[in-house]
């Protein structure tokens, strides 16, 4: 799980 994706998910959700 890439930190970039985690950041995007954190922004959306």
Curated annotation (Swiss-Prot):
GO terms for biological process: defense response; killing of cells of another organism. Its main location: secreted. The keyword Repressor does not apply. The modification Phenylalanine amide is found at residue 13. It comes from the Eukaryota. One of its GO terms (cellular component) is extracellular region. Keywords: Amidation, Amphibian defense peptide, Cytolysis, Hemolysis, Secreted. Transmembrane segments: none annotated. Expressed by the skin glands. Disulfide bonds: none annotated. It is found in: Secreted. Shows hemolytic activity. This is Hemolytic protein B9.
């Amino acid at each position: 799980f890439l930190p970039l994706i985690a950041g995007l998910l954190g922004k959306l959700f």
